[in-house]
Amino acid sequence: MENFKHLPEPFRIRVIEPVKRTTRAYREEAIIKSGMNPFLLDSEDVFIDLLTDSGTGAVTQSMQAAMMRGDEAYSGSRSYYALAESVKNIFGYQYTIPTHQGRGAEQIYIPVLIKKREQEKGLDRSKMVAFSNYFFDTTQGHSQINGCTVRNVYIKEAFDTGVRYDFKGNFDLEGLERGIEEVGPNNVPYIVATITSNSAGGQPVSLANLKAMYSIAKKYDIPVVMDSARFAENAYFIKQREAEYKDWTIEQITRETYKYADMLAMSAKKDAMVPMGGLLCMKDDSFFDVYTECRTLCVVQEGFPTYGGLEGGAMERLAVGLYDGMNLDWLAYRIAQVQYLVDGLEEIGVVCQQAGGHAAFVDAGKLLPHIPADQFPAQALACELYKVAGIRAVEIGSFLLGRDPKTGKQLPCPAELLRLTIPRATYTQTHMDFIIEAFKHVKENAANIKGLTFTYEPKVLRHFTAKLKEV
């Protein structure tokens, strides 16, 4: 099979979910009712759902079977210990707190790390800044809710869709150190390493870059949190693109990766393949005080620390899913599927970010150059794609980035991208071909697509619930 151009999906489909087909008129009415916001569409009105890969894919038979072992004890559940053991074996982290999903971990650790920096280093809350290669939207939101400004320090190649570069998710190391010196190290409560970098197009971060980032963090005694939603995809890219690790297993690369952080926060709904779940973990005893404080907050916000908002069966499923998500054949297929979609779109003249791990990112700014950034070209493209083919995608651009919480002005966005997110083991190559054909129709009418303006704008994470209309 090594010489075949395309390999089929490396799994058998045993259970199916019927979906309905709708008319163009029906879809036009539905998107207007949703306030031109695909997040607000009913799922039954969506033919192909590319909104997110978070908890929307299939699970493996071993994960499903593991649920039957669930211990639903309120405290001290053996299912918790099974999960904690998986974390120790895979990441090498000693302390585990389960959460209902990634943002559950964020709402716990962010205030704890800010308080710790304030007590130990005299952090000035009016001047505090956290750094990342690129903050995920909810991490940014939780930071801002806690009064912390965020700053993304990414390499110049990151958002240039005309450039191919192996590790577009990398930190700008000079920019990171310069930023730390500028605000004062004591005013930096944490650094977040996002692997892969979702907002940059699912782009990986090299191990060499993570090592160098961690060295800078240790120089200034700043804690590093690994945003780990797509840890396995990042490890796969390292194996493929970083020569030093080409003969390492995904498991070995993962273990090495997590040496270069102090904590991990994870939405387990991505690479751990579960429909619901998250993790907050600390590496060793040097962060035991943080673990203790986070456990206390977990009780208030998520649940008792040995279940954290998850039933026992869900913890068992997650304990297995962490392993299943690292399967090399599975990762090779998944990333090849994304590459196939990107190649097909570029063949018809639709410019994309280079293929990442979980999605194709269309450069909406280039497809719709007549729509200015403050009229959200990628959001307008998402609405048109739904009208044409019933495909739901998500904007990653100015609409998502939002406003400066201090000035109220729109934050400048490095690129206006439309994310076509591929749920795991859910759609076939035929679906990819249909998506490509849909873009042919969208491209033909591109000049007539209109920009958007708000009719309702929430102050925080506006892209989830905002409503808009055509200009």
UniProtKB/Swiss-Prot annotation:
Q: Does the keyword Acetylation apply?
A: yes
Q: Name one GO biological process term.
A: L-tryptophan catabolic process
A Pfam family this chain is assigned to: Beta_elim_lyase
Where does this protein chiefly localize?
A: cytoplasm
EC number(s) in its UniProt entry? 4.1.99.1
| N6-acetyllysine: residues bearing it | 5, 115, 156, 450
The subcellular localization recorded is: Cytoplasm
Q: Name one GO cellular component term.
A: protein-containing complex
Q: Locate the N6-(pyridoxal phosphate)lysine modifications and list their residues.
A: 270
Extract the GO molecular function terms from the UniProt entry: identical protein binding; L-cysteine desulfhydrase activity; lyase activity; potassium ion binding; pyridoxal phosphate binding; tryptophanase activity
Q: What induces it?
A: Repressed by cold shock.
Keywords annotated in UniProt? Acetylation, Cytoplasm, Lyase, Pyridoxal phosphate, Tryptophan catabolism
How does gene deletion manifest? Not essential, cells do not produce indole.
The organism's superkingdom is given as Bacteria
Metabolic or biological pathway, per its Swiss-Prot or TrEMBL entry? Amino-acid degradation; L-tryptophan degradation via pyruvate pathway; indole and pyruvate from L-tryptophan: step 1/1
Which reaction(s) does the protein catalyse, per the Swiss-Prot or TrEMBL entry?
Answer: L-tryptophan + H2O = indole + pyruvate + NH4(+)
Q: Which cofactor does it need?
A: pyridoxal 5'-phosphate
Protein family membership: Belongs to the beta-eliminating lyase family.
Give the multimer and partner information. Answer: Homotetramer.
Q: What is this protein called?
A: Tryptophanase
Its source organism is Escherichia coli (strain K12)
Instruction: Write the gene name.
Output: tnaA
